[in-house]
Amino acid sequence: MDTFSYRDAELFAEGVALSRIAERFGTPTYVYSRAHIEAQYRAYADALAGMPHLVCFAVKANSNLGVLNVLARLGAGFDIVSRGELERVLAAGGDPAKVVFSGVGKTRDDMRRALEVGVHCFNVESGEELERLQRVAAELGVKAPVSLRVNPDVDAQTHPYISTGLKENKFGIAIDEAEAVYARAAELDHLEVIGVDCHIGSQLTQLEPFLDALERLLGLVDRLAGKGIGIRHLDLGGGLGVRYRDEQPPLAGDYIRAIRERLHGRDLTLVFEPGRSIVANAGVLLTRVEYLKHTEHKDFAIVDAAMNDLIRPALYQAWMDVQAVRPRDAAPRRYDLVGPICETGDFLAKDRDLALAEGDLLAVRSAGAYGFVMSSNYNTRGRAAEVLVDGEQTHEVRRRETVQELYAGESLLPQ
């Protein structure tokens, strides 16, 4: 479903004109659709109906409290990688018993806080982490539920920066070492083994890597059962891709159906950690044209959003669709859309055919995931506002940063 559509030659988010949002909240502004978020979550939950499951939204994709609250109200779980993300989930009304704690660098404080609030499990990524968790749990006099993140050595066929399931990646425990680590976990009196986890990458557009990883994990589950180590849940992580341009990723329902067909009656709770597929196409970055600059070699549309607001094009060479909020009936020109940051790499899109004038509003599509969460204050620029649209209602779920807030935590040297 696409909740961003044109009505009377103007782009709307659900029932609200984007021009109205720009007038009220300014630009640049991230705009999210509640209806899209809910529909994408339900696509997972509905496909898993009739079997024990947990759909844990990957907070790293979009950690805004308003977005998290929408998902918490639906009964979602959450996949976190830091104490900060845990506190966000709690503040948004999330159930800690539905939280899985991933990440390669959990500190002792991270572990203590997660044990205090009672997370569902820790996705342990190394033998060293396992031993630390045992010590922290012993200090608190509790048992820590653990699932080992296993690296199945599967090529996710995605951008190398977001491929996480190969031997050379920093994530997880190599599958040929996993049985020994599980045996050690079973010996430790303050740990309880409950599952196996993997996450092979992000923005996957084919089922084959997922199914390859699944077969390897099921083989591991069977071998562990033969050694008396029971696995109760199978966490297949996230990674399902979305359409940015012309990709044709599988639908969540087709993906889950293929997984269920291969379980062959095993009594396992299925856990998924979707992020991008829930929120990417639920959001746009709304920006305004400041200048049109024409040179001998290039035409530039200089907009008020920049790489500090949306770094995906510069960092990943990601293609983002750009639409005029009010398209002009004029001959287009080919523009690079660039921001005010003092780097050549500050661009949102290149070689786009658009009919533009100074002051026009543009919507950078598919910006709901890894957009605001990766933003910065580079060039001492305040981060954008965030607005959540619900039907014909708009809610400012994060106000724009002021200049004074950018240095509020700093101080001068004493005289």
Curated annotation (Swiss-Prot):
Residues at the active site: C342
Enzyme kind, highest EC tier: lyase
N6-(pyridoxal phosphate)lysine: residues bearing it: K60
Species the sequence originates in: Pseudomonas aeruginosa (strain ATCC 15692 / DSM 22644 / CIP 104116 / JCM 14847 / LMG 12228 / 1C / PRS 101 / PAO1)
Binding-site residues, pyridoxal 5'-phosphate: G239, E273, P274, G275, R276, Y370
HAMAP family noted in UniProt: LysA
Catalytic activity line of the entry: meso-2,6-diaminopimelate + H(+) = L-lysine + CO2
GO terms for biological process, alphabetical: lysine biosynthetic process via diaminopimelate
Pathway assigned in UniProt: Amino-acid biosynthesis; L-lysine biosynthesis via DAP pathway; L-lysine from DL-2,6-diaminopimelate: step 1/1
Cofactor(s) the protein needs: pyridoxal 5'-phosphate
Subunit relationships: Homodimer.
Residue numbers binding substrate: R276, R312, Y316, E343, Y370
Keyword Amino-acid biosynthesis set for record: yes
PANTHER family in the cross-refs: DIAMINOPIMELATE DECARBOXYLASE, GROUP IV DECARBOXYLASE
Job of this protein: Specifically catalyzes the decarboxylation of meso-diaminopimelate (meso-DAP) to L-lysine.
Xref: InterPro entries: Ala_racemase/Decarboxylase_C, DAP_deCOOHase_LysA, De-COase2_C, De-COase2_N, De-COase2_pyr-phos_BS, Orn/DAP/Arg_de-COase, PLP-binding_barrel
Name under which the protein is recorded: Diaminopimelate decarboxylase
Keyword list, A-Z: Amino-acid biosynthesis, Decarboxylase, Lyase, Lysine biosynthesis, Pyridoxal phosphate
Single GO term (MF): diaminopimelate decarboxylase activity
